[in-house]
Amino acid sequence: MTAPATVPAAVTALRDSRLGRAARARWAGWGSPHLRKIVLVGLGGSALLALGSLGAGAPPVYDPVKRTPVLALLRDPIGERAALAFVYAGLAVLGMAWLYLGRALRRGEEGTDTGRLLKIAALWGAPLVFSVPLFSRDLYAYAAQAQIAHAGLDPYRFGPVSLPGPFLDEISGMWVDTPAPYGPLFLGIGRAVATVTGDRVVTTVFVMRLVAVAGVLLTARYLPRLARAAGGDPRVAVWLGVANPLVLAHFVAGGHNDALMVGLVVAGLTVAIEATEERWVAVGVVLCSAAVLVKAPAAVAVAFLAWVWAGRLSGRAVLVRACVRTGVVAAVSITVITGLTGLGFGWIDQLNASSQVLTWVSVPTAIGMLIELLRGVPNFVTYQDPVIAAVRFGGQVVTAAVLFWLWLRAGRAGWVRMLGLSLLAVVFLGPVVQPWYVLWGLTVLGATRLDRRAWLVFAGTSFWLSMMIAPQGSNLFLDWAPVIAMPLVAAVATIAVLGRSRDEVVEPVAAPGKLVVSAPPGDRELGPVASVR
C-alpha cells in the first residue's frame, strides 16, 4: 500500500533537486506562463505531425516503418486512418498555436523578443526534421536527380527513368521522363550528397531535407537584420518567415528546395542593404545569383538590388550605372558557379516542366479553366488544352509588365516591399501555384512595416494554404470540399485570434529586443504598400 506514495515523493525529490530547480528556472525564462503554454501546444502539434507521418506521410516504396514492430501498426487500414487524423490535428494545433503566438507578440508579452521567437520556431521544427516526408514527394525527386548527376548523366536531358533502381521506384509516373527543372547549384549539392550516401534512399532523402533546413537556418539568421534595415519589426519577420506553419510543414517536413532559394535571397538582400561599401553590395548580388541557380524566381531579387547599388553611387545616371554593375556581377557569378558544377545551362529549357499541374489558385490557369467550363468542355482540361496554354502565355506577358511597373516604383515606395509584391505576382500570375510558393514573397514582406490588415491577410493565407496539400502530397485545390471549407476555417480562426487586438499595433522595434506599442495608426499611416528603405 505504500508503493504508490513513493511516486509523488520521487517526483517531488526530482523537482526540488538542483537539476529540477535549474530546469524550472530555464523553462521560466521562456516567457510568461501564457506564452509557455503556447510553446507547449505548438510543440504538441508538431509532435502529432511527426507521429502521423509514420502512417500517413509519403514513405519510400521499401518502407522501413512496415518492418518495425509496433510502428507497423500505423500501416494497417485502421492505423493509417488514425495517422491521418494525427496529421490534420497536428497541423490545426500548430496553426492555432502560431496564431496565438502572433497575438502574444502584438500584445508585447514577456518572451516575444526576436531571440526567443527563433528558439520557439526551432523547437516546433525539431520533430519535423526527423519525420517521414510530408505533403510532398519532391524529396524523392531531388534524390533521383542527384543520382543522375552522380552517375555522370546530364540531368537536364535525362529523367529518372534513365537510371533504373531504387530511386526510380519512388517517382510518380507523371514525372519519370521529366528532366530536372532546378539550377546547377542545387543539383551540384545533390550530386555531392549522392557521392556520400550512395544508393540508400532513406539516407539520401534525409540529407536532402537537411539542405532545405540549412536554407531555413539562413533565413532565421539574416531575416531579423533585414527587417531592422528595412524599417520593419524583426519579431514580426521571424513570426511570418520562420515560425510560420507553412515553413515548418513544407520547408522542413516537405524539404522543398525553395527553402534554400529563400535563405540565399534573404542573406543577399541583408548583406546588400547593410553594405557601407560597394563590394558588399556585390556580395549580396552574388548570393542572390546563387539563389537563381537553385530556382529561377530568385532572379527578381537580383533585379531589385540595382536600387541598392544606385544608393551607393553619386553623379549622373546612377540607376543606369547600377543596373549595369548589378547585371555584370550577376552574369559573372552565374557563369562561374555553373562552370564549377559542370552541369551547364540546360535547366533554362526545363523551367516550364511543372506546368503539367493545374490549380485554380494560379490566376491565368483559373481563367482558362473557367473559359473551358463556360464553353461546355467536360470535366477538367489538361495543361495541353489550347485555351489554357494561351491564357497562361498571356499571364506571363502581364507578369512581365507588373514586375517592370513595381520595379519602377521601388525608388518611391520602397524596394524591399516592391520586391515582396513582385515575388507574389510571379506566384499568382504564374502557370502553377503550390502553397509554399507564397513564402517567396511573404518572407520578404514580413521584413517591412505591416499594418493590421496585412497581419490578418498574411496570417490567414498562411493558415489556409498550409492545409491545402494532403499528407502524401496530392493537391486538394481541385476537390471542392476543402476548397470551400479550408478558407472559411482559416478566416474564422485568424479573425478570432488576431482580429481581437484592435487597440494595439506593434511598431518597428527601436532597438533589438525592445518593444514599442502604440495606438492604431490613422489614415495618414501607410498600409500594405508603405514606403520602406
Feature locations, PLM:
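Aromatic-enriched
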Residues: 449-533
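Aromatic/glycine/proline-enriched transmembrane-helix motif characteristic
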Residues: 200, 229, 335, 353-429, ...
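Loop-to-helix entry region of an early transmembrane alpha helix in multi-pass inner-membrane enzymes
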Residues: 83-85, 184, 198-218, 385-394
